[in-house]
Amino acid sequence: MIINGKELALSLKQEMAANVATFTEKYGRVPHLVVILVGEDPGSVSYVTGKAKASEEVGIKNTTIRREATITEEELLGIIDELNADDTVDGILVQLPLPKHIDSDKVIAAISAEKDVDGFHPMNVANLWLKQPCTLPCTPKGIIKLLKRADVEIAGKDVVVVGRSNIVGLPVSKLLLNENATVTIAHSRTKDLKEVTRRADILVVAIGRPKFVTADMVKPGAVVIDVGVNRDPETKKLCGDVDFAAIEPIASAITPVPGGVGPMTITCLMENTIECFLRKMEK
């Protein structure tokens, strides 16, 4: 079975659009997301365009602030301070990566935790691990939604997460633990990686290496979630971290690239913006 993230994202956005219409009537305004784009990195520009399109689809106001790559860290922090103080702004997102002269961690920490729609603020990260209410990071949240909508049982399953980034690997491991899975985190220093991945009932791969996971690394009948977005060195087409063509016949379910996890990430960003808006309005 191919887990279609595009279809699920579409149905979730339709639900959200109906909810936003109701909230607008109740509170007199729509949720407002501000995205800050520094420089002209083609990947970043594409992501920001996608976020603006998704905002429009669900009825969220989207403002994109564009700045040259030469902006100073101090100037960027000044923009964030202004947005933190602006009551008409519900969510703030700084598109990563940032130019080398700007400290990304400092910028993320400067965003108000209440407006941090990416779920990267240290307060949100701490609350995730403490199982306290918080804004969840979009990709891990989207992965759990995909698994549940595909009726994949998580509790009691052996899950292997390949990758240990703060953005995907670590937070998705915690969310899977919260769902009562037995989680193993594998990475570049893991010995006998193939032996580890072949134990997985659910395999989540987030390492950013094209077609790294091959068919002999996957247990027949496993569920495979491919988080990678890469260019195939040979065909130059988009591909994931797993060899989809070779693994799809042996997996019980698999996400494609594109059209799997990606659409869910943006949809969960919309959901996070609405949640930040509601928390503020219901105070």
What does each of the following model-derived ranges do?
Residues E75-D87:
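Short, well-structured alpha-helical segments in soluble
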